[in-house]
Amino acid sequence: EIFFADNDNSLQLVLKFAAENWYMVLIGVALIVLLAVGYRRRAKVEQLFAGVWYYVSGVVVMLVAVGLAVGGVRGGFTKMTRPITLSNATLYTADNARATMILSNPFSILRTISSSGKLHYEKYFDEATLATIYSPEHFPAEGTSATELTGRNVVLFIMESFSAEHSALLRPDLYEGEEQKGYTPFLDSLMRQSYTFYNMYANGKRSIQALPAVWSSIPSFKSPFVLMPQALAETHSLPAILKNKGYETMFFCGSDHGSMGFGAYARQTGIENLYSRQDYEKVHGAEDFDGYWGIWDEKFLNYMGEVLSEQKQPFFSTMFTLTSHHPFVVPQEYEGKYPKGKTPNHQCVGCVDDAFRKFFAKH
């Protein structure tokens, strides 16, 4: 500032600042002297060609450095880990507005440099006209069954790679003349005595798109919503709505704590308590890791039941299963117990269905 200000006392100010910070002046002079001495030193003449081990060791070091760099960028070396994004800041604060204070400018620029910026959408109707056609807001009348559920516990299951085609109840046409009548016998029996919807529409196609679709009714975009800058915006999600009504909110997933960005988005939507593979292993050890994604669903469902049995009520809990995820393996003791079916996933679906049967029987 003193060099650009329009004044006549710049030299006096410089001398005063130098006197007050004399140790910094000495350090600066010492650095200059060291640079001058080092510059005059004769550099060792490098040989144009070296021995074969020089190049072999150089290639090995380069490959190791590249591998470490990839792991550093991704945040780990497992399939469960994804590179962190803006929404990961919400792991350290429940307030989306404060999350922006945690983020650094260089990181934000790098993560959003390929973003198209503001979302563009077509507006075909004004608000008044649209309200007469369809409104997403529904207000049940007093005395209806919906209002009688106030204060009840809510448990939501998000089942990996499950679809209607696995169920003989939902898609009986697929099993006409087939010896195997579906792969979800327990869930079918549950749906027969439950309030079941037969019309289902996908709001996401990949695991990473599931939570915004299910909790917040946010559809899929070209990029998963949790990886977009807009993910830090306020959303009226189901966990936040129930939290404001006095519910304890929890999210269970047997994968690693930072897997797929689930934990970050869960925090952002009002989830207070996260339970992951690390939490399970603190209680039950690491023997139930499936070797790929996390804890087997049967074991983790039982763990969730243990936690919920001690939980303050009312509570809202979500469980995201993973055993039916690729590469479609089941615990060794269950190999061959469930129908192999026509796809590699069918045996896993049967295994998870049985895990739900045991969970409902015990908890």
Where are the model-predicted features located?
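Internal/C-terminal transmembrane anchor helices
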Residues: G51-T78
